[in-house]
């Protein structure tokens, strides 16, 4: 490969990379993850320690889908999206 071709690919990468990063950052969270399947979780022992935040309609962020589902057993909350809740 010639050095001109390598320079072209490098510059093209620098130009296009911010576009793809911005696209993924503004994608709606609902399109990235589905509503948690709460039938899988019945007790805290079912929950992993993996941080995958879930935002509920009460504006509370839950550690992951399992903790969201356990709270849903005792409170009338609904899933909003995967991620940390933000002020609206």
Swiss-Prot record:
InterPro entries named among the record's database cross-references: Kazal_dom, Kazal_dom_sf
Residues of the site described as Reactive bond: 49-50
The organism's place on the tree of life at top rank: Eukaryota
Domain Kazal-like, residue spans: 32-87
Compartments reported by the entry: Secreted
Tissue: Expressed in epydiymis, in the caput. Also expressed in seminal vesicles.
Example of a GO MF term: serine-type endopeptidase inhibitor activity
Matches recorded under CDD domains: KAZAL_FS (cd00104)
Gene3D superfamilies: 3.30.60.30
Annotated keywords: Disulfide bond, Glycoprotein, Protease inhibitor, Secreted, Serine protease inhibitor, Signal
Designated name of the protein: Serine protease inhibitor Kazal-type 11
Organism of provenance: Mus musculus (Mouse)
